[in-house]
Every structure is written in structure tokens, then in C-alpha cells.
Amino acid sequence: MLKKIKISLILALGLTSLQAFGQENPDVKIEKLKDNLYVYTTYNTFNGTKYAANAVYLVTDKGVVVIDCPWGEDKFKSFTDEIYKKHGKKVIINIATHSHDDRAGGLEYFGKIGAKTYSTKMTDSILAKENKPRAQYTFDNNKSFKVGKSEFQVYYPGKGHTADNVVVWFPKEKVLVGGCIIKSADSKDLGYIGEAYVNDWTQSVHNIQQKFSGAQYVVAGHDDWKDQTSIQHTLDLISEYQQKQKASN
């Protein structure tokens, strides 16, 4: 127990060095995570409860790469305005990590402002069936990107929160963007599972653990992302859900 407390304290102290930006903007909270990588957080309401949605953007020598989007189209312009105000650069690439609005909802907007937009073919198929705006470019489940001097990788670990959820790995920064397949450490349950594959979720998380064991930071898709026990907590939540399901049958 003391060991766990000590580890949590070390992580908390390390994260206090994060530089906060955009506090004056009520639509988006931006925090510098590492080097040129920033976490942005927006807020929306689901089933009467307010939640935070987290994603990241990377400032490169060519422009800004945005993973996912603010949660709610009313925040799109203020978000990109804030980026330009802080960095003097425009968004040149947007990548959606699955088909839900808090991830793919900005594809049309980013395309209109001149950014190249990307999703997996699986996400594109879902968006097409739902008659929603789609990315300009699609790729198979895994893809490596090189933008100027920066590199990162999109990886499909398997089904979990949705059939199409992917994660994004920044090797230089050792940062993993878990998206919604990774639950925050303060999550009480698995959240929305209307499109989830709970029986596949555990193996998918194990795939993430094995492939990115060197991650220094894991950014969960919602709520608290600074507590770095989110991967194990996700596994615990899946196990709890499965046990309850067995007990009720």
C-alpha cells in the first residue's frame, strides 16, 4: 500500500510541472505535456452528466497535428484560434481515433480550414453508414506518420470501447494517447458500452500494454488523465463488469 502511495505521489509531483495554457478560454483547457505535445480538454454533457474529453495536438515545424477534436462543434473555431494565437501555426492534419462525435466530429470542420483529415477504413465505414462527415484520407488499422521532423504512429489494438478504436503513440515523447479504450483512473464504470466489445476489451488493452510498455504518459479519453494508473484501472473495470454480468445470469 505504501509503495502504491509513493508511486502515485511521484507521478503527481511530476505532473505538477505541466504548464497550463488557455485558462482564459472557457471552451478549451490546454496543458503542455512534453516538448511540443499538448493535451486539450473540452466539456460536454452526456445523459445529464458533464464529462471532460481529452485529446492531444502536436506542434511541428510544418504546422499543427490535432488528434481527435473538441467535444462539440461550437468549440471548433475557438480551439483552432487558440492554437494559432499560442503557436502562430495552423492545423495541417486531423486524425480521428474512432467514429464517435468527440473524436470524429471535427473532420468536416478541419477539412474546410485546409487540414488533411484521416481515419481508419473501419471508422470511415461506420461514418458512411451513419451518413456523417468522413475523412479525406483513410488507412488500414495501423499507420506511421512523419510530419516535418516529428513522427508518430496510429495503432489498432483490437475491439474495446468500439470496434474501430485506435491509439496514437508518440515515440520521442513516450506518450500514448489512449482515447476511449482507456478509462480514466477516476472512472466508476466503463461508461457508454452501447457499441462496446467487452469480451474483447481486455485482450486489446493487454496488446497496448505489451506494445507500448515504455510509455511515460498515457492520456485517457475522458476526465482525469494525469493519474497514470488508467490502464490497470481499465482492466479492473472490465473485470468488474464481467463478474456482475455472470452473477446476473
Swiss-Prot record:
Reactions catalysed: a beta-lactam + H2O = a substituted beta-amino acid
Cellular component aspect of the GO annotation: periplasmic space
Subcellular location: Periplasm
Keyword Metal-binding assigned: yes
EC identifiers of the protein: 3.5.2.6
Highest taxon in the source lineage: Bacteria
Cofactor, free-text remark: Binds 2 Zn(2+) ions per subunit.
Chief localization: periplasm
Span of the signal peptide: 1-22
Residues binding Zn(2+) 1, per UniProt: H98, H100, H161
Cofactor(s) annotated in UniProt: Zn(2+)
GO BP: antibiotic catabolic process; response to antibiotic
Keywords for this protein: Antibiotic resistance, Hydrolase, Metal-binding, Periplasm, Signal, Zinc
The UniProt record lists the keyword DNA repair: no
Top-level EC class as recorded in UniProt: hydrolase
Binding site for Zn(2+) 2: D102, C180, H222
Residues engaged in binding substrate: K183
Coiled-coil stretches: none
A single MF term (Gene Ontology): beta-lactamase activity
PANTHER family for the chain: ACYL-COENZYME A THIOESTERASE MBLAC2, METALLO-BETA-LACTAMASE DOMAIN-CONTAINING
Cited function: Confers resistance to the different beta-lactams antibiotics (penicillin, cephalosporin and carbapenem) via the hydrolysis of the beta-lactam ring.
Quaternary structure annotation from Swiss-Prot or TrEMBL: Monomer.
Protein family (similarity comment): Belongs to the metallo-beta-lactamase superfamily. Class-B beta-lactamase family.
NCBIfam families documented for this protein: bla_class_B_core, bla_subclass_B1, blaB, blaB-IND-MUS
Record-given protein name: Metallo-beta-lactamase type 2
Organism: Elizabethkingia meningoseptica (Chryseobacterium meningosepticum)
